[in-house]
Swiss-Prot record:
The glycine cleavage system catalyzes the degradation of glycine. Its EC number is 2.1.2.10. It comes from the Bacteria. The keyword Membrane does not apply. The glycine cleavage system is composed of four proteins: P, T, L and H. The keyword Transferase applies. This is Aminomethyltransferase. The lineage of its organism: Bacteria, Pseudomonadati, Chlorobiota, Chlorobiia, Chlorobiales. Belongs to the GcvT family. It comes from Chlorobaculum tepidum (strain ATCC 49652 / DSM 12025 / NBRC 103806 / TLS).
Length: 365
């Protein structure tokens, strides 16, 4: 099993470690609820170095990535990032990813840990059509640290005084020096809170992690495991590969039409998406349940007549709302907020209702 550059720190801090995407990763330290609340109320530090990262370089790099992904990469400029998808020809999802435009001929990609090898092979299998474009896998050399929460920019200002990180627009990034190395600081995240994700060489990861933990001590910063990362993203309704999105899911039936630009030139999966746009059958929705039973992936969902209408994608008890919440893929007729539903949990029908997403921070743009 692979380890990140921060694994020894996590173990020394008493983290409970698990296998995730082939990496030994912290699932929790003090506990999921306490860590979740730290991010919502103060600040949390995440090691997400298990994520894959690639460089795509060459004069035709933009053309190549436009063909491979659904969003319109021509709309962003140097120093900007974009959330996007890679699709199979039938419209199924290869992965969701973020692409960072470093320059006109250099792009940096961050992909899901569990899909890293698959994604690299998928990109490699099409790159031959674009002469002069190179694909490089830097996953084993780079660490990724996320600082998230309302106190994030106060903490960053102590470690990087005068850098102006707080002035970064959403999905923008800058490069900064840190202990003789160049690091990339991006205004991105997976929690719905203010914050950044920082990419840097493995050799500098412990030093930066320690500096941020020390700088955030007075603000109540906490190290955060993958357990709270999941409850935080679920409260926001963000997709997770293998749950809301996967091989046999079309993005237009998963609340991701906004990243599928059917008006741009051809990309893999475009025709399949055009067909689904004409006649979508289902949608990913949020829901909450009465009582305390926790909905889990693949649990069946029923309508008021006890007819099966879909299944659960993700579920948990929301630490913020203190009630069971989840996402489900439902037939379109039952996707409207307020629609009554029932989830079968251990042989019992648990009543609930479709909810508007996100569950928290609905007032934010």
């Amino acid at each position: 099993m692979k380890k990140t550059a921060l694994s020894a720190w996590h173990e020394a801090a008493g983290a409970k470690m698990i296998d995730f995407g082939g990496f030994l990763m912290p699932v929790q330290y003090t506990g999921i609820i306490a860590e979740h609340k730290a991010v919502r109320e103060a600040a949390g530090l995440f090691d997400v170095s298990h994520m894959g990262n690639f460089y795509v370089r060459g004069a035709r790099a933009l053309e190549f990535l436009q063909y491979m992904t659904t969003n319109d990469l021509a709309k962003i400029v140097d120093g900007q990032a974009q959330y996007t998808l890679m699709l199979y020809p039938d419209g199924g999802i290869v992965d969701d990813l973020i692409i960072y435009r470093v320059s006109a001929d250099t792009f940096f990609l961050i992909v899901n840990a569990s899909n890293c090898e698959k994604d690299f092979d998928w990109l490699s299998s099409h790159i031959g059509q674009f002469e002069g474009v190179a694909l490089e896998n830097h996953t084993s050399e780079l660490s990724l640290i996320a600082l998230q929460g309302p106190k994030s920019f106060d903490i960053l200002a102590r470690v990087f005084p005068g850098a102006g990180i707080d002035k970064l627009g959403s999905f923008h990034f800058i490069k900064l020096p840190f202990e003789g190395a160049e690091i990339m600081v991006a205004r991105t995240g997976y929690t719905g809170e203010a914050g950044v994700e920082i990419c840097l060489p493995n050799e500098r990861a412990v030093a930066l992690w320690s500096a941020l933990m020390e700088a955030g001590k007075s603000d109540g910063i906490q190290p955060i495991g993958l357990g709270a990362r999941d409850t935080l993203r679920l409260e926001m309704g963000y997709s997770l590969y293998g749950h809301e999105i996967e091989r046999d899911v079309n993005p237009l039936e998963a609340r991701l039409k906004w990243v599928v630009k059917l008006n741009k030139p051809n990309f893999i999966g475009k025709q399949a998406c055009e067909q689904v746009e004409i006649n979508p059958r289902k949608s990913v929705v949020g829901f909450s349940l009465e009582g305390r039973a926790i909905p889990r992936q693949h649990f069946k969902v029923y309508n008021s007549d006890k007819q099966e209408i879909g299944e659960v994608c993700s579920g948990t008890v929301s630490p913020t709302l203190q009630e069971p919440i989840g996402t489900a893929s439902l037939l379109l007729d039952y996707a409207q907020p307020g629609t009554p539903i029932f989830v079968e949990i251990r042989g019992t029908m648990q009543p609930g209702a479709v909810r508007r997403l996100p569950f928290v921070h609905a007032d934010r743009p």
